[in-house]
Amino acid sequence: MYRLTSKLVIYRNIGKDSILFKLADIFQRFSTGQYVKEDLITEIYDQIHNLLDLSTRYGFDKNLWHNYLAFLLAMSENPFTLVSEKVGANEGTVNEFAKGDFAIFKQLFDYDFSAIEKELGIDCFSVVLNYKAIVKSEQIFNKSVSEKVQQLSTDIEKAEDESEMYKIVTDFYRTYGVGKFGLNKAFRVNHNENTRQAGEILEPITTTGNMSLDDLIGYESQKQKLIENTEAFVKGKKANNVLLFGDAGTGKSTSIKAILNKYYSQGLRMIEVYKHEFKDLSTIISEIKNRNYRFIIYMDDLSFEEFEIEYKCLKAVIAGGLETKPDNSLIYATSHRRHLI
């Protein structure tokens, strides 16, 4: 396995701390014979534990090894995958490196674990290759991510070679995107700097609800204006920031969440930002401005007191500072205070 992972080029950014690279290191030591059996088994079980933990988090089932490899491909943001997200399969020398990596992943998909299991007297790899997950509520894991990754895994299983796998994966990138923005609908600010990736401030919201505009009775003209504005936005046409105002319980927040569900498949994403997080708006915009999605920055129950100054950060984004708000983002806010207009 180490001989395979060491040759990765495009997907080398998967990282040495990943399950894949940890297992590759274990298999390298196994191949040399320079190991303590009990210690090696312990290290293998550590990675199996990590695999089970990830699989539970994302609701994976059946072949967890294949699902994990598909997950790596779906989440790996690099120059090749980000370009594929925008244009799909494309001409260029980089494709030779990509196909080389896909040939490696194809071998990893077909990897034979029987030798190490026989030598160490374990069967954990056989178990995860034929896994039956406990039925879980969809509230426990992100169903959207789970279904996409498992379908990608199934499609790769059927690929004959790296060229076919190249088409499958690049089509996936073009259809769904790559990384957290490709696989998730909604996001929030992550205040824990220890869990942030470099240059990233947003984390996925894994449960967003399945509300629909049809669930709201009345307000037909308002809903139609919201639909028309959002539809223009996702199509790259001129659209406006939106303020929904009215009494509590009139469906303002539900309308915006329903809009996300309606246009998610067309590339719409939503970022929930609270008033105390307005200072982070410029950082948020820096993270999303070059991505091939349309982002609604969602502010719920917006209001300001006379002594509060957070509105200045919002005003700078709307009015435009040195770095203007990019064309792929709009602000949708709700409030019970009409004077905010």
Language model: regions and residue ranges:
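Walker A/P-loop
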Residues: N241-E272, T283-K289
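Pre-Walker A adenine-sensing motif
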Residues: E220-K235
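Interdomain "pre-motor" coupling segment immediately N-terminal to P-loop NTPase/helicase cores
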Residues: A133-L202
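Dynamic helix-loop-helix/coil hinge segments at AAA+ ATPase domain boundaries and subdomain interfaces
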Residues: I156, I201-Q224
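Intrinsically disordered, low-complexity N-terminal extensions of AAA+/P-loop NTPases
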Residues: M1-E157
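Phosphate-binding P-loop
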Residues: P204-T207, E231-A239
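Walker B catalytic acidic pair
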Residues: D300-L302
